[in-house]
Each structure stands twice: as C-alpha cells, then as structure tokens.
Amino acid sequence: MSKYIGPDCRLCRREGMKLFLKGDRCYTEKCAFAKRPYPPGQHGQERKKLSEYGMQLREKQKVKRIYGVLETQFRRYFEMAEKMKGIAGENLLSLLERRLDNVVYRLGFASSRGEARVLVSHAHFKVNGKTVNIPSYLVDVGDVIEVKEKSKSKPRFIEIKEKYAKRPSPKWLEKDAENLVGKVIALPTREDIDMPIKEHLIVELYSK
C-alpha cells in the first residue's frame, strides 16, 4: 500500500473518529471531523453496514493511520507480536506504542505523531546519549529520550516546551518537562492505551 498524501482530516472522517493527526487543530472548532462526523464523498452520510471482513479491514486501517505505519511494516509488527508471549493483539499495540515517534508524542515533545515523526527524522532527539533519526526505533525499559541540547533553543522546541511538554504522559513513561527529557520505566500494556481500538479484529484478519 502506498503512502497517503491527502488531507489528514479526511482520514478521521473515513474512520469515524478523531485520530489526532493535526495536533492543536484536533482540539478546536476547526476540526473537520467535529464539523462533519461522517465519511467524505457524495454519499458519506449514508453509512453502509460493513461485512465481518470489512470491519476487520477498517480496524486495521484505523490503527495504521493512528500510528502512521504502512502495510509492510505493520505486517512485520504483527508477526513480531505473534512470536511474543501473551496476547498477539495486545502485543501489537505495545510494539506500536514503543515506536520512538510515538514516545516523543506521548512525552509531549511534539504536537502530533506526524510532527514527532518529522522531528525524529531531522535528528533532534537522542536515545541513551546517541542521536537516533529512525521514527520506527523501538524503545525499551530504561531508555532515556531527550531533545538534543542545540535543538532546545530552536523556536519550535521553545513553543513545544510551553504548550505540550507539561501535559500528562502515560504511566510507563516519566519525564522532566523543564529539560525535555523522558525515560521508559515500563513496557506499555493494554490498559495504557486509551484509544477505542478492537485489536482482536486485526488478529482475526491476519489469521485467515
């Protein structure tokens, strides 16, 4: 599947929920989903009843879009999840949460996962003292994530510190908002993921 390059707000409308892809805009009256909470297109308001396969596919697409992952990589995460101890669906979500771009977002060091992905790619972050510019890098317990010292003085990071860094982070992360430093103190569990995701549908889809 190729990368989607259209408006992010159309994806929220397609999935029938806010995916929080646009940062601040998602919390304002400008949010397209808040104005039109139905799929885009001429017949968008005429929601059709999905088949079992349709519901499974829709759930997979939703999760891929939340985390900004394409099909090949998403399938690879699922294969990893199946080999891990525990429940495959919950393992899958835990792996996605451990992506560096997601962790940066969860720490409040970016307004959205999309911005976090860009900032990581532009080498603004260190993990355990070393620069990491791979958004899909999987963090582990004990890892320390920080904004590079020379990046902290950039206007965008000054704004991030003022607007986002002090927002609450999940319990598996701890942070020093003043210095833009975070640490992984546990692996994320299903209870830590507050989004309405039906991961069992994804497991059923890939198990066919």
From Swiss-Prot:
<protein>
    <recommendedName>
        <fullName>Small ribosomal subunit protein uS4</fullName>
    </recommendedName>
</protein>
<comment type="function">
    <text>With S5 and S12 plays an important role in translational accuracy.</text>
</comment>
<comment type="function">
    <text>One of the primary rRNA binding proteins, it binds directly to 16S rRNA where it nucleates assembly of the body of the 30S subunit.</text>
</comment>
<dbReference type="InterPro" id="IPR018079">
    <property type="entry name" value="Ribosomal_uS4_CS"/>
</dbReference>
<dbReference type="InterPro" id="IPR005709">
    <property type="entry name" value="Ribosomal_uS4_bac-type"/>
</dbReference>
<keyword id="KW-0689">Ribosomal protein</keyword>
<dbReference type="InterPro" id="IPR002942">
    <property type="entry name" value="S4_RNA-bd"/>
</dbReference>
<dbReference type="GO" id="GO:0003735">
    <property type="term" value="F:structural constituent of ribosome"/>
</dbReference>
<dbReference type="InterPro" id="IPR036986">
    <property type="entry name" value="S4_RNA-bd_sf"/>
</dbReference>
<dbReference type="GO" id="GO:0019843">
    <property type="term" value="F:rRNA binding"/>
</dbReference>
<keyword id="KW-0687">Ribonucleoprotein</keyword>
<keyword id="KW-0694">RNA-binding</keyword>
<dbReference type="Pfam" id="PF01479">
    <property type="entry name" value="S4"/>
</dbReference>
<dbReference type="GO" id="GO:0015935">
    <property type="term" value="C:small ribosomal subunit"/>
</dbReference>
<dbReference type="GO" id="GO:0042274">
    <property type="term" value="P:ribosomal small subunit biogenesis"/>
</dbReference>
<keyword id="KW-0699">rRNA-binding</keyword>
<dbReference type="InterPro" id="IPR022801">
    <property type="entry name" value="Ribosomal_uS4"/>
</dbReference>
<feature type="domain" description="S4 RNA-binding">
    <location>
        <begin position="98"/>
        <end position="163"/>
    </location>
</feature>
<dbReference type="InterPro" id="IPR001912">
    <property type="entry name" value="Ribosomal_uS4_N"/>
</dbReference>
<dbReference type="GO" id="GO:0006412">
    <property type="term" value="P:translation"/>
</dbReference>
<comment type="similarity">
    <text>Belongs to the universal ribosomal protein uS4 family.</text>
</comment>
<comment type="subunit">
    <text>Part of the 30S ribosomal subunit. Contacts protein S5. The interaction surface between S4 and S5 is involved in control of translational fidelity.</text>
</comment>
<dbReference type="Pfam" id="PF00163">
    <property type="entry name" value="Ribosomal_S4"/>
</dbReference>
